[in-house]
Amino acid sequence: MRQIAIYGKGGIGKSTTTQNTVAALAEAGKKIMVVGCDPKADSTRLLLHGLNQKTVLDTLRDEGEDIDLEDVLKTGYGDTKCVESGGPEPGVGCAGRGIITSINLLESLGAYTNDLDYVFYDVLGDVVCGGFAMPIREGKAREIYIVASGEMMALYAANNISKGVQKFANTGGVRLGGIICNSRKVDNELELLTAFAKELGSQLIHFVPRDNMVQRAEINKKTVIDFDPAQPQADEYRTLAQNIDGNDMFVIPKPMTQDRLEELLMAHGILD
């Protein structure tokens, strides 16, 4: 069972990328569980065709400790198992704690079955605070992929996340598997992301081009592979899934200093 955490700044398309990749892996016959670790609880919506799944934290609040696995785990596209951690009530408590609570509950309820090929954690990634680092800190997820684009803030966030991965790699055995570019059609984006990944000592695992088909599928509450499997964009996610499935390059990243990151951005025309 490979346990993978997907990080990236808010709004970068992390949940969309994760679900489309999971759909491609499921199409290829893989058994997968997706654990949403974002208070927005939108990490499984496309796999569940828009079903607004009740989160682990909401279920705990409503039902108390007496919970069955089927109360929090729903089956989605390609027999994927879908769980949403959820978050605390706004202004009260720490969302990171919710992730810790959820993963512990899933373990105690026997969600991590031996037939699973993959567990994906879709994690809010602007902040690598203790709770959001839970999937990597506790040694659950061994592989990290960071979703980024050629935009400055996406790369700042990706570099910061790399610092968190580096910190836990030395103690926990977690490794960076690569950078996923979710394109924003920025000038020189492919070259910049390739150079950025190389600078970290990693690789660009795939460049996902921007395509309105992704939004069209989302409006229909589906992944692209589910909505229109013959689309070229569906093949992009299949390629990404294959690259992750066959990946053997796992590194302790070497995050950049602020100055070096800005040099890189300037060299590729992102900063003046």
UniProtKB/Swiss-Prot annotation:
Keyword list, A-Z: 4Fe-4S, ADP-ribosylation, ATP-binding, Iron, Iron-sulfur, Metal-binding, Nitrogen fixation, Nucleotide-binding, Oxidoreductase
CDD domains in alphabetical order: NifH
Modified-residue entries (ADP-ribosylarginine), positions: 97
Post-translational modification: The reversible ADP-ribosylation of Arg-97 inactivates the nitrogenase reductase and regulates nitrogenase activity.
Reaction(s) catalysed by this chain's protein: N2 + 8 reduced [2Fe-2S]-[ferredoxin] + 16 ATP + 16 H2O = H2 + 8 oxidized [2Fe-2S]-[ferredoxin] + 2 NH4(+) + 16 ADP + 16 phosphate + 6 H(+)
One GO BP: nitrogen fixation
EC number(s) stated in the UniProt entry for this protein: 1.18.6.1
GO molecular function, one term: 4 iron, 4 sulfur cluster binding
Binding site for [4Fe-4S] cluster: 94, 129
Domain of life assignment: Bacteria
tRNA processing is among the record's keywords: no
Function: The key enzymatic reactions in nitrogen fixation are catalyzed by the nitrogenase complex, which has 2 components: the iron protein and the molybdenum-iron protein.
Assembly behavior: Homodimer.
Similarity comment: family membership: Belongs to the NifH/BchL/ChlL family.
Name of the protein in its database record: Nitrogenase iron protein
Source organism of this protein record: Desulforamulus reducens (strain ATCC BAA-1160 / DSM 100696 / MI-1) (Desulfotomaculum reducens)
Gene it is expressed from: nifH
